[in-house]
């Protein structure tokens, strides 16, 4: 049974990728794996693409000991070798290695995942104050143009600065990374931008390294 499952999974992960996939979402979680008699932490990466028709599909999965640039580069090149092309925007958490690999392999821009960013932002706010802060942050993503979104971001950061200095500091440092998508076609709206990440982590909670075990 296990051999049959392995064969089907390997065939799925090695299948050719056809057509253009402009948007590529990448998410990572951590699991414990038994290797050579020891329990070690490994990164499990999943890549979800969206094609020009708006169809979503899991394009690849990989595991690795770290999330350094060589790992990301090897993973993205494996997708390219299977035929992945036309990638314009890679959406993921704030991984410097992934940012460099996306540029190297696909010449694509990197969009910081808004779901992860929002959780990081709210971790700097007391729970009872979060609804008001969320309402302010949402006004940024409701803007119709990149210029308006950047202006609203700065205004919201200044509004929050006195009460939430750590949140304002995060906003100052991450504005360009979170608003990259505003330079792309409006069809990639905020709701669609967040769909794969919400599906992967549906609960409204602070980010954490999820536990579990992979077989040896």
Give the role of each language-model region:
Residues 2-91, 96, 104-108:
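RNase H-like nuclease fold core
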Residues 28, 89-96, 101-138:
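Conserved beta-strand -> loop -> alpha-helix junction used to position metal-binding or nucleic-acid-contacting
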Residues 19-22, 73-77, 100, 128, ...:
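Conserved phosphate-chemistry cores used by DNA topoisomerases
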Residues 23, 41, 69-73, 92-99, ...:
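Amphipathic alpha-helical transducer elements in NTP-driven molecular machines
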Residues 9, 16, 52, 58, ...:
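A detector of single, family-specific signature residues
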Residues 33-34, 99-100, 179-180, 200:
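Short helix/loop capping segments that flank catalytic or ligand/cofactor-binding pockets
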Residues 142-216:
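Acidic/histidine-rich catalytic cores and adjacent linkers
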């Amino acid at each position: 049974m296990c051999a049959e499952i392995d064969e089907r999974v390997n065939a799925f992960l090695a299948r050719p990728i056809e057509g253009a996939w402009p948007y590529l979402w990448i998410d990572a979680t951590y699991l414990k794996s038994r290797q050579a008699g020891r329990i070690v932490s490994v990164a499990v990466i999943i890549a979800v693409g969206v094609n020009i028709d708006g169809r979503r599909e899991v394009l690849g999965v990989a595991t690795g000991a770290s999330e350094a640039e060589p790992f990301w580069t090897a993973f993205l090149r494996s997708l390219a070798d299977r035929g992945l092309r036309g990638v314009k925007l890679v959406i993921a958490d704030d991984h410097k290695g992934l940012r460099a690999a996306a540029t190297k392999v696909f010449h694509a821009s990197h969009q910081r995942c808004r779901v992860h960013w929002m959780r990081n932002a709210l971790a700097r706010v007391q729970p009872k104050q979060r609804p008001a802060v969320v309402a302010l942050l949402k006004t940024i993503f409701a803007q119709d143009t990149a210029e308006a979104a950047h202006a609203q971001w700065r205004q919201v950061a200044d509004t929050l600065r006195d009460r939430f200095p750590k949140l304002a500091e995060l906003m100052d440092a991450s504005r360009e990374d979170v608003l990259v998508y505003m330079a792309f076609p409006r069809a990639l709206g905020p709701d669609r931008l967040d769909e794969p990440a919400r599906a992967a982590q549906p609960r409204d909670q602070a980010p954490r390294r999820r536990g579990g075990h992979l077989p040896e």
